[in-house]
Structures are given as structure tokens and as C-alpha cells.
Amino acid sequence: MKFSFGLNLSAVLVLAACAHQPMQKPDAAPVPTAVDNHAPEQGTGLTEQKLIRAKHYMAASANPLATEAGYEVLKRGGSAIDAMIAMQTTLGLTEPQSSGLGGGAFLVYWDNKAKKLTTFDARETAPKAATPALFLDENGKPMGFMNAVVGGRSVGVPGIPKLLEDVHKRYGKLPWASLFDKPIALAEQGFTVSPRMAKSIEQNLEPLKRYPQTAAYFLPDGKPLAAGTVLKNPEFARSVRLLAEKGSAPFCGAVEE
């Protein structure tokens, strides 16, 4: 049986978050939305890719370490969903600007044997107390992009932990806890900061300086992490270990508290 799947993952983190545009009255004049000159993430280089075919399985992701995590799972006899879970969790560590357990996702799953396509909507949702004025300033004007995104204001209710748990129950082969061995080890022992992650840190120095926790992690000694630096994240390992041991339930309790 062969499977293929596509993911569109969004992390509600300091470096990248999903922010909803403020609602405006129908009869009001359009209000320009300030983006604080926030440009899309810059590329770190172009590489010509050649077509590659595989007889049995293949793993691909936005980071080599995450790809290795997926490949190792497939090599052990895991399903495509097993590999996805290992890769997505690893991406939360190695590319925090774009992925994370605190975000949401769409998942498109193709069962080649049954010739059936199944889609999952696990996008993060706004908190219960959110109102249309959430991203308006004290004057009722739309907040600047970075002021709206950075910090807890833009955080939604995460969907990824529950998604991973649910699709594993449906399509997983390997034991749930075993899928998190790689990201836990990388977080505890250290992983190499990629050029892409380093570039994202350089582009977001001011927002990262606003909070002691982000400054300490991404800007040790006041300087941005350089590509090639070995970085450890024991707090991430602790969260993933909770996910491995207790499923998505802690993300509605222990972790979020």
C-alpha cells in the first residue's frame, strides 16, 4: 500500500503567526493596514533539483533533520502518517519560524489502495473571548502587523496535537510514543541551526528582544544565532515527551498552563 499526503502547517509562534484582519463596518472607508514594512521571509539560496523516484518510500520536508526523522520511521516499517508525525514534530524544533505544536494545519491524505481522499481541518481557532476589536489599537485603528502578531494576542487554540493523535489512530502503524524519539533527542542533545532559521532570526531582531524568553533562546549574549550553531531546547523536549506519553490531553492542561 502506498500513501501520499500534503500538509499546510502554520505555527502560532513569535517568529510567524496567523493574524486575522480586523472587521470593518460595511459603510466605513477602507483603512490601510500597516504591515510595519514586514517583508516575506527571504530565501537563503537556490539549488537545482533533479527528479528522484523511489520504489518503496520517500520522505521530504523543509529541513534535513526532519526529513531524516521521517525516513527513519519509514525504514522501521511505519506508515506515511507515522513519518509525517515525526517530521512535523521535528520541524517545530528546527524551523520554529514556520512550524510548531502550538499551531494548526490542513492535512490531505490519499489512500492509494482504497482510492480515497480524506482531508482534515485542524486549523487553530480564535480564543472564546476574542472579538472583532482584538487587533485594533486604543483609537480603533488596525494595529501594526508586528504589534498584532508578536506576543500572546495572536495566539489561537492549537489544532496540531489533536490532529496528530487522531490520524495516528486511523492510519498509524508504529507505537505512538516511538515517533517522537528523534525530536526529543535533537532537542536534548542539540541540533544545528540552519541558514534559513538564522536568516529569520536576523530579520526579526526587534520582536525577539521584547521578551526575555525569546531573547535568551534566539539571541544569546545579545547576538542572533548563527547558522551552524548547536542549539538545545530542553523545554521543547519536555513538551514533546508529554505528547508522547499522554497524547494531546496535556495541551489542554499542563503545557498551556
Regions found by a protein language model. Give the residues of each.
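Bacterial N-terminal signal peptides that target proteins for export
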Residues: 1-9
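C-terminal motif of bacterial Sec signal peptides marking the signal peptidase cleavage site
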Residues: 16-17
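Short, conserved catalytic or interaction motifs in soluble domains
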Residues: 20
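Noncatalytic scaffold domains of N-terminal-nucleophile
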Residues: 23-68, 72, 80-81, 85-257
